[in-house]
Amino acid sequence: MTTILKHLPAGQRIGIAFSGGLDTSAALLWMRQKGAVPYAYTANLGQPDEDDYDAIPRRAMEYGAENARLIDCRKQLVAEGIAAIQCGAFHNTTGGLTYFNTTPLGRAVTGTMLVAAMKEDGVNIWGDGSTYKGNDIERFYRYGLLTNVELQIYKPWLDTDFIDELGGRHEMSEFMIACGFDYKMSVEKAYSTDSNMLGATHEAKDLEFLNSSVKIVNPIMGVKFWDESVKIPAEVVTVRFEQGHPVALNGKTFSDDVEMMLEANRIGGRHGLGMSDQIENRIIEAKSRGIYEAPGMALLHIAYERLLTGIHNEDTIEQYHSHGRQLGKLLYQGRWFDSQALMLRDGLQRWVASQITGEVTLELRRGNDYSILNTVSDNLTYKPERLTMEKGDSVFSPDDRIGQLTMRNLDITDTREKLFGYAKAGLLTASSATGLPQVENLENKGK
């Protein structure tokens, strides 16, 4: 069976991930006119730029959908977001600022939950608005086929007939108007935005040029912290975790993770926390650039990692970072449910996250500027009395340290011999300043 259909399968049911925007509206109407039977599925991901979810399925019915459903994906999305925080599943960082993989997390949820809903309706052909140059086309492909083994893929944006007739937004708008729908294009921004309640992605158009900075972006989850005219008073916030799960903000306990994430977004958003500018490698290895918002994820991540460093030992922390980066890359590639990802997730959640219990107090200022004011946990292995510089009882004596240092003589001797061996082989050069062979300075090479 052919998995990807290049032309519209007339007379068959086609499920379309329907956002209500111009692209999917025109595609749905066009498919109905060409003889297909479109079913519309809209994911409620708590998008911060969407204020009336119930209106979206109604519009789909007006444009010719056989049926239209709104699927509430918020609970599952937040669950996956918390799992990503527990695992440190983030691999794109620049200058210490992190991209929290909020779009890949959203695709993992919509790519499974929408296809599962389609399967309930006997719909085994799926279309969405992802382009052939991006990451989402592969993410949706993988998650869709994982969920429904009989699934076939039809994307109007890969159909030459659709492209020839409605190849641009102007043509789509004219098509909608000609069909009796007073659909006007929204005001064109200098970039495109995709969002869910975990974060927002701003990319393309002017942002493809690296001389266009974050300053052209209008945040939808935060504030323009770079604009000095925007008043942002400092704010003290506490975050509490129990066994790796965020449970309270500023002393208020949440039984609903969705409400907790919304409040974390509000707190972090007041400061522009979690905004970053990243150059990344797409799945196809080409580089792209995005500006990201994730105020709630950033707030929880900072508190989680503060507790992590006070609770776990050095090797565990090192593996958390190493495995987290591996897992983040798998998540980015649309492999969040693959066996290699599940293996990493299980270890990180079982042996790392389970011990993260405690409370962190921070002072948030502008953007990603913050201070940690206090860290409290019954599980802390940080114990100041062990290494206090003040006189008093100690867990080890000066003689103990002398013995430990004496044992270092063995590897110090070995290292010295290796350095002079490298010098003899011409790999290092003598240094009168240090008395040890060293790597030749780059500025001295070729002189």
Curated annotation (Swiss-Prot):
Residues that hold ATP according to the record: 17-25, 43, 129, 131, 136, 194
Residues annotated as binding L-citrulline: 99, 135, 139, 192, 201, 203, 280
GO cellular component, as recorded: cytoplasm
Recorded catalytic activity of this chain's protein: L-citrulline + L-aspartate + ATP = 2-(N(omega)-L-arginino)succinate + AMP + diphosphate + H(+)
Binding site for L-aspartate: 131, 135-136
Name of one Pfam family that matches: Arginosuc_synth
Keyword tRNA processing: no
Gene Ontology molecular function, alphabetical: argininosuccinate synthase activity; ATP binding; protein homodimerization activity
E.C. code: 6.3.4.5
Cystine pairs: none
Subcellular location: Cytoplasm
Key word ATP-binding present: yes
Keywords: Amino-acid biosynthesis, Arginine biosynthesis, ATP-binding, Cytoplasm, Ligase, Nucleotide-binding
Pathway per the UniProt entry: Amino-acid biosynthesis; L-arginine biosynthesis; L-arginine from L-ornithine and carbamoyl phosphate: step 2/3
Main localization category: cytoplasm
Stored HAMAP family: Arg_succ_synth_type2
Similarity remark: Belongs to the argininosuccinate synthase family. Type 2 subfamily.
PANTHER family xref list: ARGININOSUCCINATE SYNTHASE
Protein name as annotated: Argininosuccinate synthase
Gene name of this polypeptide: argG
